[in-house]
Regions:
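N-terminal signal-anchor transmembrane alpha helix of single-pass membrane proteins
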Residues: 1-19
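Membrane-proximal, non-transmembrane interface segments of integral membrane proteins
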Residues: 37-107, 112, 149, 181
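N-terminal mature-domain "stem" immediately C-terminal to a signal peptide or N-terminal signal-anchor/transmembrane
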Residues: 14-40
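Structural detector for internal amphipathic alpha-helices that build alpha-solenoid repeat scaffolds
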Residues: 73-84, 106-115, 137-148, 168-180, ...
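Amphipathic alpha-helical scaffolding segments comprising HEAT/armadillo-like alpha-solenoid repeats
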Residues: 51-54, 77, 83-97, 117-128, ...
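Short inter-helical turns and helix N-cap capping residues of alpha-solenoid HEAT/ARM repeat scaffolds
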Residues: 100-101, 131-135, 162-167, 196-197
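Residue-level detector of extended alpha-helical repeat arrays and alpha-solenoid scaffolds
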Residues: 22, 37, 53, 57, ...
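Positions within ordered alpha-helical repeat solenoids
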Residues: 27-34, 46, 65-69, 114-117, ...
Length: 219
């Protein structure tokens, strides 16, 4: 019974936030003009001086995810990011990673990719070698998504690193994202040569062909 009441309460909260913010958030995200934080806060009728509640921010990130999934090709990225600044989404995500449950941490890591959010490498680094496999992998993929340093070093450090089908899809999406935003992507040939896992070799061979690394592509 408690679970039913809890779900109903969460649904009411979601509906309230949806009615209050969704259409204006979508309009701002699709606006071709660059809008300031003040303009966006004013359009959303949001008081930036108040401390947003975690439950509210979880719903805001859900709305941002929905907007991104439907309108990804049309979104004005600067305005979309400024919405996140207005709601202090980065602060929320980093607090979830530092103090949240394991489930909350994994959700925050996935959200960073879903909404093209951000968390500092200093916060992420503690999870890159975590004993919990799901948390470790989620952190590594988010690190690959964000980092401009050496984000693929895990393939150098662990030649036995395995990739499931889902991992390959995730990694391909990360490579597409990095290409889109202009981040450096290393040559894949070294992992074709060094990996002990056949499916990892095949994955990177396919990526070489896709990215037209003709000098690196195996014959």
């Amino acid at each position: 019974i408690y679970g039913i009441f809890k779900r109903r309460k969460e649904k009411r909260r979601y509906n309230k936030a949806f009615d209050k913010y969704y259409e204006e958030m979508k309009s701002i995200s699709l606006d071709s003009n660059i809008l300031s934080e003040e303009e966006i806060a004013d359009r959303l009728q949001y008081d930036t001086k108040k401390r947003p509640k975690p439950n509210e921010l979880r719903i805001i990130t859900q709305l941002l995810t929905e907007i991104k999934s439907v309108h990804e090709d049309d979104i004005h990225e600067l305005n979309y990011q400024t919405i996140q600044t207005v709601f202090q989404i980065t602060r929320f995500l980093e607090r979830e990673l530092q103090f949240g449950s394991k489930r909350a941490k994994i959700q925050a890591l996935k959200l960073i990719q879903s909404i093209n959010g951000y968390a500092s490498e200093a916060v992420l680094v503690r999870f890159l070698y975590h004993r919990e496999i799901e948390l470790r992998n989620s952190a590594r993929y988010t690190y690959m998504w964000l980092s401009q340093g050496d984000p693929f070093r895990f393939f150098d450090e662990d030649i036995g690193m395995k990739l499931r089908q889902w991992d390959m899809m995730e990694l391909h999406a990360i490579l597409e994202h990095r290409k889109k935003v202009g981040y450096n992507t290393p040559s894949f040939i070294k992992w074709v040569n060094t990996s002990a896992e056949e499916n990892v070799k095949i994955f990177f061979i396919n990526e070489i062909r896709l990215y037209n690394e003709t000098d690196s592509a195996p014959i």
